[in-house]
C-alpha cells in the first residue's frame, strides 16, 4: 500500500488484522507525536478476501462497487489551465464589484438586489460576500420606502427571496397586494411565468405562520405546471420551471443551482455576456478543483482495500461521499476541507452499513462499546476480522483528522466531533436492539432514537470540524444544546429517510421505520401515513426557515450549514433513496458536476 503523503505515516494502518490479532488500544487524541516520525515500511495490502465465517448465514443486501469509484483515481488536471482561469476571473471581479457598490438610491438598490440574485443563482456570490452584505443591509433598512409603489411580482418576490436567504426577515405582507377582494391570488398574474416562478421560489422560505406564503406555494405550483405543459413558455423557460418544481433553488445544492441556471441564463435574450462568461469560467475552475480532490480521495479509499477486508454489505461510494461534501461548501477555498469531509462521510456510511445491514447484535454491541471507550472492549479480540477492521479504520480516520487540524490549533473541533459521533454510534446500536426484538415501538419512542441515528447533528459536527475557525468552541456548545433549529432538521432528515427508503426496508424485512410506527400508532394505511409524514416534513422545513432567521447570535455561515445538511437530504431523498440506489438523479448530478464539460 502506497504511503499517504498528506499525513504523517505514524498513524496509518501498519498492522495486518487477522482474526487472532490482539488490538492494542490506540488512544485518541495522540499526545506523544514525535516531530519526525520513524520511517516505517508498509506492507502492501492483501488482495485475498478475508471472509467472515458467518457471512453465508446472514441475510444482507450485497452492494456492487459504484461505477464511479475507478473513474477519477488517475485523472490529470492541468495546473496551468487553472492558473489561466483564475487570471481571467480576477480581471472580471473588479467590474462586478463596481456595479454592486454603485450609486445610492432606492431604484439603484433594487437593481443591485436583483443582481445579487443573479450572482447567487450563477454560483458567483462567494466572490462578493462583503459587498453583498452591505448592499442588503442598505436594502433592508429602507425596505418600506423601496417597496412603496412597487407592483412588479418578479421584483418583489426576488427581493424577498434574497433578503430572507441572507437572514433578513422581510415581511410577507407585501404579497397581499397580489390578492383580490375574494382573498385569493388575482387571476391576472397566473400567466406571468417569471413572476410566478419567483413567487414560488420565495414561498420556499416561508415560516410556520405565514399562511399567505402557503397559499402562494399552492397557487404558483398549479399554475406553473400548466404553463410548463401547454407551450406558452419558451422551451428553456419551461425546462427551468420543471426543474424548480422538482426541487426549488432553496432546497437544491448551490452548485447544482448554478449548473442549471447557467444553461437557462445563456438562453435568455437579455443576458449579460460578461456575467455569463464569468459564471462559466468560475464553474470550470470549480470543476477542476473537484477532479483534483476526487483523485486524492479515491486513492485514499483504495489504499484501505475495503473489498478485501469487508463482506459486500458496504456501499462503495467514495465519489458520492465527495459529491455530498460539495453540498456543504462548494467554493474552491474549501478544497482541502472537502477531502477531509468526504473521509468523515465514509466513516458515517461504514458505521451505518455495519450496524444496520450486517453486524449481529453482539458484534454491534462490541463495536459500540469499543468506540465509546475509544479502545477495544473485552469482546473485540474474539470478533471477526471485518469488525476489527471497521473499528481500526474509524479510529485511524479520527487520528488523521487530529493530525491535520492540530496544526491549525483546532484539536477541540476533532474532540467535539468525536463526542457527537459517539451519540450516533449509540443510536445505531439502539436501532439494532429494536430490530432484534421485532417489537414495533410507538412513533414517539422511535423518533427519540431515529432522530439521532439519521445523523444530522453528527454530519453538522463534521461540517464544522472541516470548515475552519468559524466553527469555534462556542458553536459546538450550541450544537450540544440541541436547539429547535437542529431538532427540526433531525426530524426532517429522519422522516425523509424513512419515506424514501420504506420499500427498500420492507424488502429486507426491516420493519422498525417511521412509516410503520406511525401506521401502527394511528391505525392508518401506508399511503395515509406517508401523506401525514410528508406534511410533517414540510412543517419542519418551515421551522428551519424560521429558526434560520431567529438565530441571530450565530454567524450566517454556521446557520447556513444546517440548511446545507437539509439540502443534501433533499438531493438524496426527493426522488427515492438516492444514496443507497444512486442510479438516477444522483448519477445525473455527478455527471453534470464532474464529467460534462462547460462550453466557454
Swiss-Prot record:
UniProt-listed CDD domains: Terpene_cyclase_plant_C1
Reaction catalysed by this enzyme: (2E,6E,10E)-geranylgeranyl diphosphate = rhizathalene A + diphosphate
Annotated residues for binding of Mg(2+) 3: 497, 505
Tissue expression: Stele, and tips of primary and secondary root.
Cofactor(s) listed in the protein's UniProt record: Mg(2+); Mn(2+)
Residue ranges of the motif DDXXD motif: 352-356
Protein's UniProt name: Terpenoid synthase 8
Source organism: Arabidopsis thaliana
Lineage: Eukaryota, Viridiplantae, Streptophyta, Embryophyta, Tracheophyta
Encoding gene (name): TPS08
Amino acid at each position: 500500500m502506497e504511503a499517504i503523503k498528506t499525513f504523517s505515516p505514524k498513524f496509518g494502518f501498519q498492522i495486518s488484522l487477522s482474526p487472532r490479532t490482539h488490538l492494542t488500544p490506540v488512544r485518541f487524541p495522540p499526545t506523544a507525536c514525535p516531530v519526525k516520525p520513524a520511517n516505517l515500511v508498509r506492507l502492501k495490502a492483501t488482495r485475498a478476501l478475508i471472509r467472515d465465517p458467518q457471512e453465508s448465514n446472514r441475510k444482507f443486501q450485497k452492494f456492487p462497487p459504484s461505477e464511479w469509484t475507478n473513474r477519477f483515481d488517475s485523472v490529470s488536471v492541468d495546473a496551468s489551465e487553472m492558473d489561466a482561469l483564475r487570471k481571467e476571473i480576477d480581471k472580471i471581479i473588479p467590474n462586478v464589484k463596481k456595479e454592486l457598490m454603485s450609486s445610492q438610491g432606492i431604484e439603484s438598490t433594487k437593481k443591485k438586489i436583483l443582481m445579487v440574485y443573479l450572482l447567487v443563482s450563477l454560483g458567483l456570490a462567494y466572490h462578493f460576500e462583503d459587498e453583498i452584505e452591505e448592499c442588503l443591509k442598505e436594502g433592508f433598512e429602507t425596505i418600506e420606502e423601496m417597496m412603496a409603489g412597487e407592483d412588479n411580482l418578479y421584483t418583489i418576490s426576488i427581493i424577498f427571496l434574497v433578503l430572507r436567504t441572507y437572514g433578513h426577515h422581510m415581511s410577507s405582507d407585501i404579497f397581499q397586494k397580489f390578492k383580490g377582494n375574494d382573498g385569493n391570488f388575482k387571476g391576472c398574474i397566473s400567466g406571468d411565468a417569471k413572476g410566478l416562478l419567483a413567487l414560488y421560489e420565495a414561498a420556499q422560505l416561508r415560516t410556520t405562520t405565514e399562511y399567505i406564503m402557503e397559499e402562494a406555494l399552492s397557487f404558483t405550483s398549479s399554475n406553473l405546471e400548466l404553463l410548463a405543459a401547454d407551450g406558452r413558455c419558451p422551451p428553456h423557460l419551461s425546462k427551468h420551471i420543471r426543474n424548480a418544481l422538482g426541487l426549488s433553488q432553496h432546497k437544491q445544492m448551490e452548485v447544482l443551482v448554478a449548473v442549471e441556471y447557467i444553461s437557462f441564463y445563456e438562453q435568455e435574450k437579455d443576458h449579460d455576456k460578461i456575467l455569463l462568461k464569468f459564471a462559466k469560467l468560475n464553474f470550470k475552475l470549480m470543476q477542476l478543483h473537484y477532479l483534483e480532490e476526487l483523485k486524492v480521495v479515491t486513492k485514499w479509499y483504495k489504499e484501505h482495500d475495503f473489498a478485501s477486508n469487508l463482506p459486500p454489505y458496504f456501499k462503495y461510494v467514495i465519489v458520492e461521499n465527495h459529491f455530498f461534501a460539495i453540498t456543504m461548501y462548494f467554493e474552491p477555498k474549501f478544497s482541502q476541507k472537502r477531502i477531509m469531509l468526504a473521509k468523515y462521510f465514509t466513516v458515517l456510511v461504514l458505521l451505518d452499513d455495519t450496524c444496520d445491514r450486517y453486524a449481529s447484535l453482539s458484534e454491534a454491541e462490541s463495536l459500540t462499546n469499543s468506540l465509546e471507550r475509544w479502545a477495544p472492549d473485552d469482546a473485540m479480540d474474539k470478533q471477526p476480522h471485518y469488525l476489527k477492521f471497521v473499528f481500526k479504520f474509524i479510529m485511524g480516520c479520527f487520528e488523521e483528522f487530529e493530525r491535520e487540524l492540530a496544526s491549525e490549533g483546532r484539536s477541540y473541533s476533532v474532540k467535539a466531533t468525536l463526542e457527537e459521533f459517539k451519540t450516533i454510534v449509540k443510536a445505531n446500536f439502539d436501532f439494532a436492539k429494536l430490530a432484534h426484538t421485532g417489537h414495533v415501538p410507538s412513533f414517539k419512542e422511535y423518533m427519540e432514537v431515529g432522530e439521532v441515528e439519521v445523523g444530522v447533528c453528527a454530519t453538522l459536527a463534521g461540517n464544522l470540524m472541516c470548515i475552519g475557525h468559524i466553527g469555534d468552541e462556542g458553536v459546538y456548545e450550541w450544537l450540544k444544546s440541541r436547539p429547535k433549529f437542529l431538532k427540526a432538521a433531525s426530524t426532517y432528515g429522519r422522516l425523509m429517510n424513512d419515506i424514501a427508503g420504506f420499500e427498500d426496508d420492507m424488502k429486507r424485512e426491516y420493519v422498525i421505520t417511521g412509516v410503520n410506527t406511525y401506521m401502527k400508532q394511528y391505525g392508518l394505511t401506508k399511503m395515509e401515513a406517508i401523506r401525514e409524514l410528508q406534511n410533517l416534513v414540510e412543517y419542519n422545513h418551515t421551522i428551519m426557515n424560521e429558526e434560520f432567521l431567529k438565530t441571530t447570535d450565530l454567524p450566517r455561515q454556521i446557520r447556513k450549514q444546517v440548511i446545507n445538511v437539509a439540502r443534501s437530504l433533499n438531493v438524496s431523498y426527493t426522488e427515492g433513496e438516492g444514496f443507497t440506489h444512486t442510479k438516477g438523479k444522483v448519477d445525473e448530478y455527478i455527471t453534470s458536476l464532474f464529467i460534462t464539460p462547460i462550453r466557454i
